[in-house]
Design a protein with these regions (language model features):
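Short, flexible helix/strand-to-coil boundary loops that buttress conserved ligand/catalytic motifs
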Residues: 17, 46, 53, 81-83, ...
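Conserved amphipathic alpha-helical interaction elements at protein-protein interfaces in regulatory
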Residues: 15, 19-22, 41-44, 76
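GIY-YIG nuclease signature motif recognition
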Residues: 9, 35, 70
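A short, surface-exposed loop/turn module that caps and links secondary-structure elements
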Residues: 37-62, 89
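Arg/Lys-rich, positively charged N-terminal/basic patches that mediate binding to nucleic acids
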Residues: 1-32
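Enriched for short, Lys/Arg-rich terminal
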Residues: 67, 71-96
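Hydrophobic pocket/interface hotspot
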Residues: 16, 35, 79
Length: 96
């Protein structure tokens, strides 16, 4: 299934990757790789991850304290937010 992104997702990812880049370039690459793999898993099987709110699903990264929310459309999934687990849990739920 195709993946589309909310316009602010790129900013979310850059912000998260920058934190890891400051620690280690390799760690930033590993974060990016895990995020891409997890998004691919969601695209392959959109119902794989549990519901979050009324219209989203939440996929947690395994090695990093981040998740992304996505919604399922007939022909694609749309990633709405990439966020840290400690950020407000409803952050991004109002993105459309």
């Amino acid at each position: 299934m195709e993946v589309k992104y909310h316009p602010l997702v790129q900013q979310d990812v850059v912000e998260a990757a920058r934190k890891y880049q400051d620690i280690s370039p390799r760690l930033a690459e590993e974060f990016d790789t895990e995020l891409r793999i997890t998004i691919a898993k969601a695209a392959e099987n959109p119902l794989r991850f549990p519901p979050a709110g009324q219209s989203f699903r939440r996929a947690n990264l395994k090695r990093f304290p981040y998740h992304f929310l996505y919604d399922i459309q007939p022909d694609f999934i749309r990633v709405m937010i990439v966020g840290h687990h400690k950020r407000h849990p409803e952050l991004g739920l109002d993105r459309r």
